[in-house]
A protein has these predicted regions:
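Short, charged, surface-exposed hinge/linker loops at domain edges
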Residues: 1-3, 32, 36-67
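Short aromatic-glycine-(Arg/Gly/Cys) micro-motifs in beta-strand/loop hairpins
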Residues: 7-21
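Hydrophobic residues in alpha-helical membrane-spanning segments
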Residues: 20-23, 58
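A short, exposed loop/beta-hairpin motif centered on an aromatic-Gly-Thr core
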Residues: 22-33
Length: 67
């Protein structure tokens, strides 16, 4: 399971990141938008790593969203 950390910025935007995948961070106008974007980006990063024979964190097919 990959953890998604999410927080609200001072300007009202939401930021979501996956700590186990450095650089996987997105913004959204809503919490849901930020989470959906970061999940999609994380899956693309994992697929790219697999395609290039790189190691990936041991994960299931789920994300755990934490405030």
């Amino acid at each position: 399971m990959l953890s998604v950390e999410i927080d609200r910025e001072e300007d009202g935007r939401w930021i979501a990141e996956v700590p186990d995948l450095p650089g996987v961070m997105t913004y959204g106008q809503t919490r849901e938008e930020a989470v959906a974007r970061v999940q999609a980006l994380a899956l693309r990063v994992l697929a790219d790593r697999l395609e290039h024979g790189e190691a990936i964190p041991e994960v299931a097919s789920q994300f755990l969203v934490t405030p």
